[in-house]
């Protein structure tokens, strides 16, 4: 079993072979912890789920942190989510004429939530491409995962997540996945459907799950989401219809006080190119800003967690895309897809 040291960030700070502090369990809860530093920014990454544990600037939290040495994250915080984003309604999907069943991990809705990679142990792929040999802090790390084919998802993916911290730009994260093979069906054992004698491309979506936070309650912050449409959901959190945000509680385009408003919805009709979502408030009235260029973003006011922040989840596709096909990515064997998001603080 590998253990990690969690002292002051330094070259190779995950220190394979060192022992973690005694948490009462004798186990390494969230895998290896890697600390990054650049200018006034510092970040911690955990290998479990290629997870962003904390991100700070001058000591101020930009995302909701947690004690990764002793506890599990609440509400998927900071996880890298693939090969689907959000929910598969009913934990089943039809693809290329074949029905697949996936594990339900949200009993209240009956859904398969947030993909397959969020609790897997990703591997550190580089020893320190950024730090100097004199022990300077590292500012970049790459984690890799081999996601093998399974009954519910009979495609194998090679995935990587590159976390890079910059003194001016903050944190940039790029997640790349490549389809490296598909299992052929051998009844009664399921496999990838065949299209014209070849395995169907792998259905794919990707997202992330940081909770933006400020030093004041969420109710006292100003949230800006430049989306013109919102996706309604039913009692099982399955999508029902897309509608304009105009005149609703979900119109955040001009930036407004969160107050008591609750949302756990996907938003779209975002500006072309790179868009920004921001949460402003607290010390110096600064904003934490999430930017990406994907067509969807989920906003969740974390009401079940007593509203410590708002989850902003850029998504390549909407909830239940494995059934609807909307904005679903199809990766042929050998094809890759990359997704990037950035987090920084704005004065």
Language-model segments: what does each one mean?
Residues 183-185, 189-190, 194-203, 210-292:
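Active-site/ligand-binding surface loops and adjacent short beta/alpha elements
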Residues 24-39:
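Short, Gly/Pro- and small/polar-rich lid/capping loops
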Residues 43, 145-187, 193-204, 208-215:
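Acidic, contiguous internal or C-terminal segments within carbohydrate-active enzymes
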Residues 42-101, 105:
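Acidic-aromatic substrate-binding/catalytic surfaces of carbohydrate-active enzymes
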């Amino acid at each position: 079993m590998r253990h990690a040291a969690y002292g002051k960030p330094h070259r190779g700070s995950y220190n394979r072979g060192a022992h973690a502090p005694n948490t009462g369990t004798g186990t390494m809860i969230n895998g290896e912890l890697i600390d990054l530093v650049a200018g006034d920014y510092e970040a911690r990454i955990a290998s479990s789920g290629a997870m962003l544990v904390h991100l700070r600037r001058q000591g101020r939290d930009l995302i909701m942190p947690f004690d990764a040495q002793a506890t599990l994250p609440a509400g998927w915080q900071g996880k890298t989510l693939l090969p689907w984003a959000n929910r598969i309604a009913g934990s089943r999907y039809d693809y290329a004429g074949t029905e697949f069943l996936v594990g339900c991990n949200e009993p209240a809705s009956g859904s398969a939530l947030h993909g397959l990679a969020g609790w897997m142990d990703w591997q550190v792929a580089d020893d320190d491409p950024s730090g100097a040999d004199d022990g300077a802090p590292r500012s970049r790390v790459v984690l890799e995962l081999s996601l093998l084919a399974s009954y519910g998802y009979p495609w194998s993916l090679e995935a990587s997540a590159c976390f890079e911290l910059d003194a001016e730009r903050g944190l940039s994260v790029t997640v790349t996945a490549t389809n490296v093979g598909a299992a052929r069906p051998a009844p009664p054992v399921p496999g990838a459907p065949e299209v014209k004698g070849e395995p169907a491309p792998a259905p794919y979506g990707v997202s992330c799950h940081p909770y933006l936070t400020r030093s004041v309650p969420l109710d006292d912050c100003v949230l800006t989401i430049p989306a013109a449409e919102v996706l309604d959901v039913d009692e099982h959190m399955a999508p029902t219809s897309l509608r304009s945000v105009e005149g609703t509680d979900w119109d955040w385009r001009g930036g407004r006080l969160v107050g008591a408003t609750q949302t756990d919805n996907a938003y779209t009709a975002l500006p072309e190119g790179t868009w920004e979502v921001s949460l402003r408030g607290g010390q110096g009235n600064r904003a934490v800003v999430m930017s990406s260029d994907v067509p969807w973003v989920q906003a969740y006011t974390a009401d079940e967690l007593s509203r410590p922040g708002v989850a902003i989840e850029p998504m390549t596709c909407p909830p239940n895309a494995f059934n609807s096909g909307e904005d679903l990515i199809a990766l042929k064997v050998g094809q890759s897809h990359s997704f990037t998001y950035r987090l920084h603080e704005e004065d």
